[in-house]
Amino acid sequence: MKLLKIGISGVRGIVGETIVPELVMDFASAFGTYLQAKKVLVGRDTRISGPMLHEAALSSLIATGCDVLDLGICPTPILQFMVRKLEAGGAISITAGHNDLKWNALTFIDQEGTYLNVFQGEEVLDIYHLGKFDKAAVDRLGKLEKTENYLDNYFACLKKYLNAEAIRKARLKVIIDPCSGAGAGVIDVFSRYLGFELIPVNNEPNGYFPHDPEPRPRNAQEVASVMKVIKADVGFLLNSDVSRISIVAENGEMLSEEFTFPLIASEYLKRKQGTVITNLSSSRMIEDVTRMRKCPLMKAKVGQSYSIQMALYEDAVLAGEGSGSVAVLEFQPAFDGFLTMGFILEIMASRKKKISELVAELPRYHIVKEKIYCPPTKVHSVVHEVKKLFIDRKMDSSDGIKVEDEDGWVHIRASATEPMIRIIAEGRSRENARERAEEVMNFILTLVK
């Protein structure tokens, strides 16, 4: 079965099967028609399918009458920042984030630099399904402009927002692995602006990912292996569009991506209190942190668009997910890996503490993340069947099924990006978390054989 995942903020699939130039042209035409000839920005990650899809999107937007500013290879958070900076009508980011090389996607961004909300997404999808796209006359075709100076715009603002002087004085040695994605090369500019010593790993923007581009401990072996040898202070892993990060401590410990958001929140909420948004699959660490800082916590469905839209609606100060995504709303309403890394460096510099010492201040839980392949036609019926396991338990059904008790929880949901059912379980011990996950996994396997 060919896989195409259509969501409120874009479309994702396997290149050559469902993600083909014709489909990209139709979706870009729908988005251009929705924007009504406003300026639109386009950027992409380094995937080898990127140039093909990029050109298809550019031509289709121009055909609808939109002026297009082409940023080329560009991390998604920088693209989002530039939408607001240039007062554009929106943007398309061509990236599949944490998915492997065979995948690619179009992500639609509105004039505020955020992913489309449900209502905006439905409008674009309606236009796409109707197939009635604006077709500009020859004298009204959009204009194409290319730019390469956007990095200085972004990093100058980031430097001003952070305490760059404290970071520079700390003389931090930092390893960053952008996985040959959109952050490759850009991390050099990042280091120059903030004044730390950069040791890059996989810093060639060639699109051939040397490992799975999901920032998780299992992909951190290369960074962890050299941490002690070169006496680095911290290491970071990035996904292909720099919207998510994970951390490697100076002692070589490959930290779960679940630590990223609580680490930021614990420090930020000392400075500015307010509502915090997370999702249903994130660790209880963030619950403990917000309780300690006396700040309200609200939970959205899993998906960056849902978290950001709830954050805007609730006037939240922070949003984040257990995937390593963090948004500081006063900087921009977007998950931003550069801001996340910079803020962690600022915490280390200002508090004069090692990353292992900062993480030790956080509560510790054990989390297990698994996924099981499930044909798209069966996903929702399988998730529904799982309810029978917990018929006598209180459950949250707002996004799949989540069952909690005093010692932990398990969350079962259909993936929005892959033909998978995700099972995430957390407990006070690794054994407890594993037991919760395996109970569900064994049941699901009987249904998908």
Locate each region found by the language model.
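Gly/Ser/Thr-enriched, mixed-charge loops and adjacent short helices
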Residues: 1, 14, 104-230
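N-terminal small/polar loop signature for handling phosphorylated ligands or for N-terminal nucleophile
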Residues: 29, 39-103, 189-248
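Proline/glycine-rich low-complexity loops and linkers
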Residues: 122-156, 160, 249-322, 326-328
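Gly/Ser/Thr-rich active-site loops/lids in small-molecule metabolic enzymes
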Residues: 117, 200-202, 253-273, 337-350
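General beta-strand structural signal in soluble alpha/beta enzymes
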Residues: 6-7, 42, 68-73, 93-94, ...
